[in-house]
A protein has these predicted regions:
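Alpha/beta-hydrolase fold catalytic core
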Residues: 1-22, 43-46, 84-85, 151, ...
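Conserved HGGG/HGGXW glycine-rich cap/lid loop of the alpha/beta-hydrolase fold
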Residues: 9-64
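Conserved acidic catalytic loop of the alpha/beta-hydrolase fold
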Residues: 70-87
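Conserved hydrolase catalytic core segment
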Residues: 85-124
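Conserved loop-alpha-helix segment in the C-terminal half of the alpha/beta-hydrolase fold
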Residues: 200-237
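Catalytic histidine-centered segment of alpha/beta-hydrolase-like enzymes
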Residues: 238-250
Length: 260
């Protein structure tokens, strides 16, 4: 693991392999370890950078609201440190929101985007209300909130099957400080709609969705790519394709990265 001092806080990242730079961004309540099953394969022909987002993993909190733009600026600082001029970004869930914020702020640096169990759309009014409820809940009972949140990301069938994987994911999630959780919920709540990027990006884009995703409705989110050149891949399970569909996802990512 490497560290960078950014705005007086520590940013943690890893840097493996050679070739086209590919940035892997985890989701809410996750950290860079979520990618460990993928790095060896992806690093065979690419330079793979995994980064802990603000208030997650070994990266410290920057404030009380971590906007997607704040995270994108931090990712940019890591790329500057590594003298990387262009990169593809693969973002899981919240990591996808950060990838799109980065694409808007630093368009000239983009080589491709994969939105994994993610969306280009802003929160609906209902989602914003739910984020507010989540902030209240995590402040009242941190452990119960985290444990329940993680289980609810898997398809119903996998909640019974992937017990060990769910426990491991919970253990990583419980390393996330309360401030980091609240700041991310606040940041996601106010994020901009960036569907326009799907229509006008001059680089390859891929949207990967789970048919049984309990968080992002499949039918609703698949409509984002209508009248775009964005490719859509679907898996039969939930919001955690990196755990629920590891082998298939590896193949899809390897195939996509050959195009960037």
């Amino acid at each position: 693991m490497k560290q960078l001092l950014y705005k007086n806080i520590k940013i943690a990242y890893t840097d493996t392999g050679k070739g086209t730079a590919v940035i892997l961004l985890h989701g809410f309540l996750e950290n860079k370890t979520m990618w460990k099953a993928f790095v060896p394969e992806l690093a065979k022909r690419n330079r793979i950078i995994t980064i802990d987002l603000l208030g997650h993993g070994d990266t410290e909190c920057l404030g009380y609201v971590h906007s997607m733009e704040d995270n994108a600026d931090m990712v940019h600082a890591v790329l500057q440190e590594l003298k990387i001029r262009k990169a593809a970004i693969i973002g899981h869930s919240m990591g996808g929101y950060v990838a799109l914020a980065f694409a808007e702020l630093y368009a000239e640096m983009m080589k491709g985007i994969v939105l994994l169990n993610s969306t280009s759309r802003a929160d609906s009014a209902e989602r914003k209300t739910n984020r507010g409820r989540a902030i209240k809940a995590v402040k009242q009972n941190y452990t119960a909130f985290v444990r329940l949140s993680i289980a609810n990301l898997f398809s119903e069938k996998n909640r019974e099957i992937l017990l060990e994987e769910i426990e491991n994911t919970r253990a990583e999630a419980l390393k996330t400080p309360l401030q980091g959780i609240v700041a991310s919920l606040e940041g996601m709540k106010i994020r901009k709609d960036r569907e326009v990027i799907l229509h006008f990006a001059a680089y390859p884009m891929l949207l990967i969705l789970g048919k049984q995703d309990p968080v992002l409705n499949y039918e609703e989110n698949a409509t984002q790519i209508e009248n775009t050149k964005v490719e859509l891949v679907n898996f039969p399970d939930g919001h955690m394709s990196h755990i629920e569909n590891t082998e298939e996802l590896t193949k899809v990512l390897v195939g996509f990265l050959k195009k960037v």
